[in-house]
Amino acid sequence: MKLDELRKKYIDFFKSKGHCEIAGKSLIPDNDSTVLFNTAGMQPLVPYLLGEMHPSGDMLVDVQKCLRTGDIDEVGDLSHLTFFEMLGNWSLGAYFKELSVKYSFEFLTSPNYLNISKDKLYVSVFEGDESIPRDTETANVWESLGIPKDRIFYLSREHNFWGPVGNTGPCGPDTEIFVDTGKEKCSVRCDITCSCGKYFEIWNNVFMQYKRDENGNYEELKRKCVDTGMGIERTITFLQGKSSVYDTDAFKPIIDKIEKISGKIYGQNLEDDRSIRIIADHIKASCFILADNFAVLPSNIGQGYVLRRIIRRAIRYAKKLGMESYVLADLVDSVEEIYKSFYKELTEKKDFIKAELNVEEEKFFKTLRHGEQEFIKLIQQLSSKSIPGDISFKLYDTYGFPYEITEELATEYGFSIDKAGFEEHFKKHQEVSKKGGDKVFKGGLADCTYETTKLHTATHLLHKALQLVLGEHVRQKGSNITAERLRFDFNHPYKMTDDEIKQVEDMVNLQIKNKLSVKRSVMNLDDALAKGAMALFGEKYEDIVSVYEIDGFSIEVCGGPHVKNTGELGTFKIQKEQASSSGVRRIRAILID
């Protein structure tokens, strides 16, 4: 069974059971500031698991993009992935343990779906502890479906209790479903808790019964929910009879392309194989981050730093294989080939993704050349095999050399690093930067005079015009408006041409000439985003937001103020377009009466 087929069968099955298919959310969480990316299928639905009503109903099915970077140094083995997809079906109070288990059993065993013999199924349930009782209810449902007691395992909290994602939130017992692969037992003690590979965990059904508070106490949820998760990549590895996900159609087109470019053959050399897997994983993750609606770009902070790190790690391993410059962009088509039927954004933003990868690769090759040369000079001066924190920080601060790459180079040359020393220098650097940063441009309106208000409305027109001329990737990165001029920062990898500047100017002035009405409405944030309203990346909004729509042209989440009609603005003129920072451009513009 192929990747696309599994995804479709899952959605079709649960839709046939009355579930509503909902679109997966962005990789960037909008309701959890504790993590940089959505790392689990349930994360975007936490508010609804806690009691909010979902606009699509109480029985849902989705496919959620996820990204985990905690194990990034492990990526390159046969199993760890940065980007992955989670299939999920959800009950927000509509049904609970019995129906959830029965749905899972039917999908797994029905000849119309996965067609796995029930004689190969093993399950685990929560054994209970001093806080939460033993889950005999779920065990009884499994037994009623023909799973004998000797294939039902009661396991501890470590194995069969899920969540919360942070320290607090929804959580509960789960039941994990395993398939006997037919391999020989590794020992007489071999069972589903063994990591030898005989038993494959195919699905997990979480029963959100409780909410954990900040004191570690558990309170029963008024509305009990079901959250199930099936990892697509893991499942197709089993269904296709492969030993590794990298042997499946989730990666084969990418690996085929790497083989063609590098001249290396996957499966012939352990070191080369690891490099190929790292490149394949990281290019896929990079494509999905760059294609995301929030338009994350490589940088030295937050999500941008993660993106920069995985791009640069892929470049290093491509270099090890002897691959030439700008090779990552050549792999984008292979990622698109795998996912284009389901993720249209990979096709729509393909040119932008390639351009950003080339820009980052060009920057990094310069960094690598200078950084590696300096690294070798510095370690030659050391009297021990330990690299002090001030040296690793100097490589980071002066040469833009990521700590992780210094760490990898140190390992290659037989050195260790004083990580605590690096972190101490890094923290001091942050404190100094923060004090200085209090004085720099943060964006926003200097006042609410009529002239400033007009320029604020012009900024909305400019934002949309830039997207239409340069591409949908354009997002506001900063804004500063006075009564005399507007200053607008936006992400874009290249200097604008004179023709592009003129196109933007003309487009804004056309909207002014058309005398479009500017209307304000108040609505739920999710409704605003569904309506197509632009929102600022990283901005934390209330549940109810103000939305300004410029008739048929622009719609943004914004607090205002704005004029009533674009005809009030006068003539829009761009005075200057220049670089603001890496990957960010700045426009200065005025209005002429």
Swiss-Prot record:
GO aspect biological process, one term: alanyl-tRNA aminoacylation
Subcellular localization(s) per the UniProt record: Cytoplasm
Domain of life, source organism: Bacteria
InterPro entries documented for this protein: aa-tRNA-synth_II/BPL/LPL, Ala-tRNA-lgiase_IIc, Ala-tRNA-ligase_IIc_anticod-bd, Ala-tRNA-synth_IIc_core, Ala-tRNA-synth_IIc_N, Ala-tRNA_ligase, Ala_tRNA_ligase_euk/bac, Thr/Ala-tRNA-synth_IIc_edit
Binding positions (Zn(2+)): 456, 460, 558, 562
Function statement: Catalyzes the attachment of alanine to tRNA(Ala) in a two-step reaction: alanine is first activated by ATP to form Ala-AMP and then transferred to the acceptor end of tRNA(Ala). Also edits incorrectly charged Ser-tRNA(Ala) and Gly-tRNA(Ala) via its editing domain.
Record's protein name: Alanine--tRNA ligase
Gene of this entry: alaS
